[in-house]
């Protein structure tokens, strides 16, 4: 597979934030009389505000916004257990050394994403697309289209690296190549992605003299 740049999801792709996410959302579910497993099954890969609107249907936007602010603070400050996933730091460092453009494109808000990126010790991206920068979150294509644009690349020149069904669908809808890493077996359209891997450690990247990037 050939490309010119990478668009990485953050949670579940570059960082293991599952313990923190499950703590925050399970506590939120219990406070609202909901089954934690139902909430956790819905939220993966989606913007927090989308999940809150789903589970707080009928509530005012002011109530939902207040709940979002509270939850955002919890997720941005309670980072215990968050670590870089195997291969993440090595891959990003290699891209930087080779001069290959890459971005982080996440459904998380800026405070939450920045906190998790920092605690995991990841290299700084050239472009950081968070929930605030798009009107429609994953699985819509907006975030990945913006990421490609900010890198100065066409969507078809980019490879999206994702673990969540919503993110895989977003990358495909944007017209990007897609690598699914540790994605659920029942992910819709999984048969349409370019590669299905279990770990970032399986990705080998080589930059050609003409600027093309070969992924194996």
UniProtKB/Swiss-Prot annotation:
User: At which positions is substrate bound?
Assistant: 9-11, 106-107, 138
State the pH dependence.
Optimum pH is between 6 and 7.5.
CDD domains in the record: HAD_ScGPP-like
For the null mutant, the annotation states: Cells lacking this gene show a reduced growth rate at high butanol concentrations compared to wild-type. They also show a consistent change in the level of mannitol, D-sorbitol, galactitol, L-tyrosine, 3-amino-3-(4-hydroxyphenyl)propanoate and N-hydroxy-L-phenylalanine.
Q: Which UniProt keywords apply?
A: Carbohydrate metabolism, Cobalt, Hydrolase, Magnesium, Manganese, Metal-binding
Q: Could you tell me what reaction this enzyme catalyses?
A: sugar phosphate + H2O = sugar + phosphate; D-mannitol 1-phosphate + H2O = D-mannitol + phosphate; D-sorbitol 6-phosphate + H2O = D-sorbitol + phosphate
**Coiled-coil intervals in this record?**
none
Q: Which cofactor does it need?
A: Mg(2+); Mn(2+); Co(2+)
Protein EC? 3.1.3.22, 3.1.3.50, 3.1.3.23
A GO MF term:
sorbitol-6-phosphatase activity
Q: Where does a divalent metal cation bind?
A: 9, 11, 163
UniProt KW Transmembrane keyword = no
> How is the co-factor bound, per the entry?
Requires the presence of a divalent metal cation for activity. Can use magnesium, manganese or cobalt.
Q: Does the keyword Transmembrane apply?
A: no
Q: What does this protein do?
A: Sugar-phosphate phosphohydrolase that appears to contribute to butanol tolerance. Catalyzes the dephosphorylation of D-mannitol 1-phosphate and D-sorbitol 6-phosphate. Is also able to dephosphorylate other sugar phosphates in vitro including ribose-5-phosphate (Rib5P), 2-deoxyribose-5-phosphate, fructose-1-phosphate (Fru1P), fructose-6-phosphate (Fru6P), and glucose-6-phosphate (Glu6P). Selectively hydrolyzes beta-D-glucose-1-phosphate (bGlu1P) and has no activity with the alpha form.
Q: Which family does it belong to?
A: Belongs to the HAD-like hydrolase superfamily. CbbY/CbbZ/Gph/YieH family.
Q: Report what the protein is called.
A: Hexitol phosphatase A
Organism field = Escherichia coli (strain K12)
Native organism taxonomy: Bacteria, Pseudomonadati, Pseudomonadota, Gammaproteobacteria, Enterobacterales
């Amino acid at each position: 597979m050939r490309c010119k740049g990478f668009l990485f999801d953050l949670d579940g792709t570059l960082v293991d934030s599952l313990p923190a996410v499950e703590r925050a959302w399970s506590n939120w579910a219990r406070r609202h009389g909901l089954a934690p497993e139902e909430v956790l099954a819905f939220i993966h890969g989606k913007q927090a505000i989308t999940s809150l609107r789903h589970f707080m249907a009928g509530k005012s936007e002011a109530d939902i916004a207040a709940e979002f602010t509270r939850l955002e603070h919890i997720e941005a400050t309670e980072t215990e257990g968050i670590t870089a996933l195997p291969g993440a730091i090595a891959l990003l460092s290699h891209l930087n050394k080779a001069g290959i453009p890459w971005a982080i494109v996440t459904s998380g808000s800026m405070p939450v994403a920045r906190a998790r990126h920092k605690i995991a010790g990841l290299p700084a991206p050239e472009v950081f697309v968070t929930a605030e920068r798009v009107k429609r979150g994953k699985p819509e294509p907006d975030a990945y289209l913006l990421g490609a644009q900010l890198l100065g690349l066409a969507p078809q020149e980019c490879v999206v690296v994702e673990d969540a069904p919503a993110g895989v669908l977003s990358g495909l809808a944007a017209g990007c190549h897609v690598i699914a890493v540790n994605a659920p077996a029942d992910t819709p359209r999984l048969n349409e992605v370019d590669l299905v891997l279990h770990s970032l450690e399986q990705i080998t990247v080589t930059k050609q003299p003409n600027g093309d990037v070969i992924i194996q």
